[in-house]
Amino acid sequence: MTNIRKSHPLVKIINNSFIDLPAPSNISSWWNFGSLLGICLALQILTGLFLAMHYTSDTATAFNSVTHICRDVNYGWVLRYLHANGASMFFICLYLHVGRGLYYGSYMYMETWNIGVILLFAVMATAFMGYVLPWGQMSFWGATVITNLLSAIPYIGTDLVEWIWGGFSVDKATLTRFFAFHFLLPFIIAAMVMVHLLFLHETGSNNPTGIPANADMIPFHPYYTIKDILGLLLMITALLILVLFSPDLLGDPDNYTPANPLNTPPHIKPEWYFLFAYAILRSIPNKLGGVLALVLSILILVIVPLLHTSKQRSMTFRPLSQCLFWLLTADLFTLTWIGGQPVEHPYVIIGQVASILYLSIIILLMPLTSLXENHXLKW
């Protein structure tokens, strides 16, 4: 009798994706983040579903419904903080996952990479809309400022903003539609994740050397299932420490004040995971220029495969490129810090220098350094 694992149409797909999948024998813990992102997505959908059972998307009651969840619903506070801090863990894993892709040249799998960039945009959109839902001060003003950026688009800008708002300001219609989209998008993301995996399994995983590992493959289970479980335990531990000891560490105190259109908070800023892009946006004095730079800061990932000039795929054996990569990492930390600071000297100039450095490392310095390394190796 044939094994059900290999004969049943549905189980066969799972088998070929997670059990008998041939994987390179040398992939490091940097390859754990894909599975962690899957767990994060499942956790967010699950906690979000239970939160949605008690949440009301009406401007009059939204803030109170979140308070009600935290105070009156059984373990509602756990659900709420798991969801809020789960988003932070999601973005930590996302940025590490993208960083791994950049370092080891995984972007050479073009289809997988481009679907990944679209996924990044979708997750960012979902997180932004989710931040609006508690209807605190930062929710309201964050929504106002970020959606208002679209008015910089020539000719159709103002109409587009009013269309998204459903009126002449961020109000009840905006909150209702943001809730609808925030609920819907994670399921679209889940479907796109399957496409992401489909493309990945067409080529197989990359590995730290960047050299094809076809001669030395091992089954995904038990080797990498065990390895992934270790990563999962570490992530869940970090998340639970965050939720149970300092749930508001990454949040903004202003969001505990109900939304008030007549009172602007002194410093409007998004959640920490958007601060680097926000800093790039603010570093350009022109509105349209800022919006373009904001979009380009993420969209630039799409052209990274086209800028690959090295004869080697991975950075493992390229010390000069490694230096640039870590400079880029430090630059992103700097931008994140600047995004949370007020718009005054010296933060403005630091933000502008960091923004120029960010773009020039990716567009100019990386390709030139790769060419220099090729030349040094006489390739």
From Swiss-Prot:
It is found in: Mitochondrion inner membrane. GO terms for cellular component: mitochondrial inner membrane; respiratory chain complex III. It comes from the Eukaryota. Binds 2 heme b groups non-covalently. GO terms for molecular function: metal ion binding; ubiquinol-cytochrome-c reductase activity. Gene3D superfamilies: Cytochrome Bc1 Complex, Chain C. Heme b b562 binds at H83, H182. Heme b b566 binds at H97, H196. The cytochrome bc1 complex contains 11 subunits: 3 respiratory subunits (MT-CYB, CYC1 and UQCRFS1), 2 core proteins (UQCRC1 and UQCRC2) and 6 low-molecular weight proteins (UQCRH/QCR6, UQCRB/QCR7, UQCRQ/QCR8, UQCR10/QCR9, UQCR11/QCR10 and a cleavage product of UQCRFS1). This cytochrome bc1 complex then forms a dimer. Heme 1 (or BL or b562) is low-potential and absorbs at about 562 nm, and heme 2 (or BH or b566) is high-potential and absorbs at about 566 nm. This is Cytochrome b.
